[in-house]
């Protein structure tokens, strides 16, 4: 079983984004079925608005069972305080949303075989940078993170493509640009495609993993 939580948040009070909902809708449509029309991921979408409580519950549910692949995709604002946040649309100056460390803890504890976290937000590579836990690797077995930008960088949207730059390349990769000779796409091949496609662009993606064998997306 493959399951995914696809999140695209635009409606931030005072700092709205334009294309995160487009990002999420496109990602949902791409991964919920294979090229031949057969089912692929069981997708739960969250579009435009989401509270901290609702996002926390949804992420917990995503990682709660023993799926072959559990994929979290987030497009929205990120904050670089306290190890990083996935900002929710009910954010405040005292609470920006869901802590990246909390997301990673849920993924690390999950019994799912492959846990893939894809973040198209500013400071995305903050995910996985926290202090080592109990002298073990920050990334638990089976966890992979693909981040749109370095931990000190912003992630850009582009009006001409009506997507985030990072997600636009993810879309191209999932449409076949990142496929191997057998037509399979893995998190590693997807990252490689995005990284090479960005060329000299200032925003640099980041790939972190602790896995012995990838399952195709």
Language-model regions: role of each:
Residues 1-217:
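Cysteine endopeptidase catalytic domains of the caspase/legumain-like
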């Amino acid at each position: 079983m493959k399951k995914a939580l696809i999140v695209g948040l635009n409606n931030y009070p005072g700092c709205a984004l334009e294309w995160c909902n487009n990002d999420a809708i496109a990602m949902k449509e791409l991964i919920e079925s294979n090229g031949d029309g057969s089912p692929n991921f069981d997708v739960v979408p969250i579009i435009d608005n989401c509270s901290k409580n609702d996002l926390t519950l949804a992420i917990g549910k995503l990682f709660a069972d023993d799926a072959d692949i559990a994929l979290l995709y987030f497009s929205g604002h990120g904050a670089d305080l306290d190890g990083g946040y996935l900002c929710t649309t009910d954010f405040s100056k005292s609470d920006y949303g869901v802590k990246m460390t909390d997301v990673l803890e849920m993924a690390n504890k999950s019994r799912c075989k492959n846990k893939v976290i894809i973040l198209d937000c500013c400071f995305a590579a903050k995910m996985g940078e926290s202090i080592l836990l109990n002298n073990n690797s920050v990334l638990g077995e089976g966890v992979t993170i693909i981040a749109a930008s370095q931990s000190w960088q912003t992630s850009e949207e582009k009006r001409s493509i009506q997507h985030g730059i990072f997600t636009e390349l993810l879309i191209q990769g999932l449409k076949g640009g990142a496929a191997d000779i057998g037509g399979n796409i893995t998190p590693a091949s997807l990252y490689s495609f995005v990284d090479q496609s960005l060329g000299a662009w200032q925003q640099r993606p980041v790939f972190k993993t602790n896995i012995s064998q990838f399952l195709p997306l």
